[in-house]
């Protein structure tokens, strides 16, 4: 049995026509990091599984950025799994103690992320065990190698053949109660009263699991449906033990502002410079030197060599994590459109909490020009720009507002 220790969820703070959408500096990977940090804020995971159908990079790798954003060391194993709702449930059911399973969606229908941290077997709380699985083929929606999407457009076929007939093949007993279903309507499988998310999505499975746990519903079945594939798992409770910890990074939604991007060529990428800056920039670390004449112990960001009192170049330093909260020291807004950067946008000098370090960062999560001097907030992973097709990730400052607090 898989033991659920903690759950984290993330929703972007923007909407378009009442549907959550990502900001221009977000993608599936930044959302995955937000959900993962919510589930595992102390960075205890020793294995990470990322499940999505919307990887930012199919070649080039997403794992290094994912681990850095989660504050996990580079020797932690990362698996990138292409799949939807059933794949997420399968990965959770097969996970071992200390595994962080992250599901993220960046599609036309769902933009969200969620994560589950697996605990030790027998630790109590909420447990999941496999019940049945059916993998069939009814490609009512397909996406080709070039990204072209085709939809057959027959909801009745999807409901009758894709969902109902596949659920029948599971052979579930009449005594087994369905408490949550993702990818189908509860009434389509005679599961009235179950928590439902008709949109099939990777993150929806974990969000449904969190809803069942929060409602303290009696144990029952969780169904994950994608087209004509279904995985069923049984949720059980160990009475008298504490429920899994659930953290939701879900700021109140606001209408997505209008952005413009100028035509032209943006700043080209230099991969040697990218490689040199990756560790301190993405791991959010500063250089700290041992005190000697001419050199103090104040953290230096970005890390760099220093000159001692005798004129010698000192390069021996250790890297220490920087705080992920701070306040706006000063700020300004750029309204002239430039290539590669959706405008307008704000930049701010952030005074990090409990540190002498001040960092120049873009502002995220609020409309341009809204951040004010002295406003507190969090440092979060964002996609700064796309340079020659390579996502250039870094950190941005998300001001704390009345609608949402500090982010992990």
Where are these regions (language model features)?
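Short nucleic-acid-contacting surface segments enriched for D/E, G, S/T with interspersed K/R
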Residues: 364-379
């Amino acid at each position: 049995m898989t033991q659920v220790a903690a759950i984290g969820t993330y929703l972007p703070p923007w909407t378009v026509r009442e549907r959550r959408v990502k900001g221009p500096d977000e993608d599936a990977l930044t959302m995955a990091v937000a959900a993962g940090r919510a589930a595992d804020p102390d960075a205890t995971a020793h294995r990470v599984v990322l499940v999505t159908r919307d990887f930012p990079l199919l070649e080039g790798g997403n794992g290094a950025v994912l681990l850095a954003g989660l504050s996990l060391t580079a020797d932690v194993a990362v698996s990138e799994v292409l799949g939807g709702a059933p794949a997420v449930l399968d990965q959770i059911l097969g996970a071992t103690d200390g595994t962080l399973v992250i599901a993220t969606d960046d599609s036309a229908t769902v933009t969200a992320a969620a994560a589950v941290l697996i605990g030790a077997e027998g630790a109590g709380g909420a447990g999941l065990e496999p019940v049945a699985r059916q993998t069939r083929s009814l490609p009512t929606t397909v996406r080709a190698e070039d990204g072209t999407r085709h939809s057959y457009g027959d909801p009745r076929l999807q409901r009758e053949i894709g969902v109902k007939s596949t659920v029948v093949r599971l052979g579930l007993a009449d005594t087994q109660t369905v408490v949550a279903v993702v990818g189908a309507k509860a009434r389509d499988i005679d599961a009235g009263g179950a928590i439902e998310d008709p949109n099939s999505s990777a993150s929806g499975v974990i969000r449904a699991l969190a809803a069942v746990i929060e409602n303290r519903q009696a144990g029952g079945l969780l169904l994950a449906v994608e087209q004509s594939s279904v995985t069923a798992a049984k949720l059980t409770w160990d009475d008298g033990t504490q429920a899994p910890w659930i953290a939701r990074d879900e700021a109140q939604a606001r209408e997505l502002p209008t952005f413009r991007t100028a035509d032209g060529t943006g700043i080209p990428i230099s991969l040697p410079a990218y490689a040199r800056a990756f560790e301190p920039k993405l791991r959010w670390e500063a250089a700290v030197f041992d005190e000697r004449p001419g050199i103090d112990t104040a953290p230096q960001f970005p890390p760099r060599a220093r000159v001692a009192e005798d004129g010698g170049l000192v390069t021996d330093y250790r890297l220490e994590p920087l705080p992920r909260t701070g306040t706006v020291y000063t700020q300004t807004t750029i309204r002239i459109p430039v290539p590669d950067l959706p405008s307008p946008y704000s930049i701010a000098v952030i005074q990090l909490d409990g540190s002498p370090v001040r960092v120049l960062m873009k502002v995220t999560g609020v409309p341009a020009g809204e951040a004010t001097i002295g406003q507190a907030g969090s440092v979060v992973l964002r996609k700064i720009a796309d340079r020659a097709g390579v996502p250039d990730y870094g950190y941005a400052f998300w001001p704390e507002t009345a609608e949402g607090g500090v982010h992990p």
